[in-house]
């Protein structure tokens, strides 16, 4: 009979002193997915918390689930706590979004688009423009809020001496575009 070997993953920290905790309002996996993060991106990011790949994969950050299953080894587990970095999660999520096919992106983005745009629109064209700029699907509605109603802006931002525009000519051009 062989004595089992136990391993322990390091705690995930909010910052250098505090653990990540749902009791303190920190996001759970389901909260992140509800906010528009892709499930695979969250899984990829969480896997990299407190673990790093070795060998030929040492510099790689984006993995498919099959790759993670293949290369994961307890040798890569760090002894120090891992700090949850929301900006890193956003960057990984943005990369996953960019790697989606246009059809996959449209399918995932449509519920967010439908919640923001209530006028007929070419969703395929819209998604082609959104995909390279999108980091989190949940931010799509605020990126599209101008489709149904022109938001109020400070008129001084429409003046441009070099292009000889005034607030009046800029407003005419914007209304013609919309």
Region roles according to the model:
Residues 1-97:
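Alpha-helical recognition segments enriched in aromatics with Gly/Pro capping
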Residues 102-178:
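Small-residue-rich helix-loop
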């Amino acid at each position: 009979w062989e004595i089992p070997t136990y391993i322990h993953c390091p705690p995930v920290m909010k910052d250098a002193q505090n653990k990540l905790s749902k009791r303190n309002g920190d996001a759970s996996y389901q909260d992140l997915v509800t906010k528009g993060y892709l499930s695979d991106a969250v899984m990829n990011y969480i896997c990299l918390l407190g673990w790093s790949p070795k060998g030929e994969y040492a510099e790689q950050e984006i993995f498919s689930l099959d790759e993670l299953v293949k290369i994961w080894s307890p040798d890569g587990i760090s002894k120090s706590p891992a700090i949850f970095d929301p900006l890193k999660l956003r960057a990984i999520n943005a990369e996953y979004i960019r790697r989606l096919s246009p059809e996959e992106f449209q399918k995932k983005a449509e519920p967010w688009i439908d919640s923001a745009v209530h006028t007929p629109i070419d969703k395929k064209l819209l998604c082609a423009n959104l995909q390279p700029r999108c980091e989190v699907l949940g931010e799509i509605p605020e990126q599209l809020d101008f489709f149904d109603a022109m938001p109020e802006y400070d008129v001084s931002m429409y003046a441009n001496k070099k292009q000889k525009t005034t607030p009046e000519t800029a407003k005419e051009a914007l209304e013609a575009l919309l």
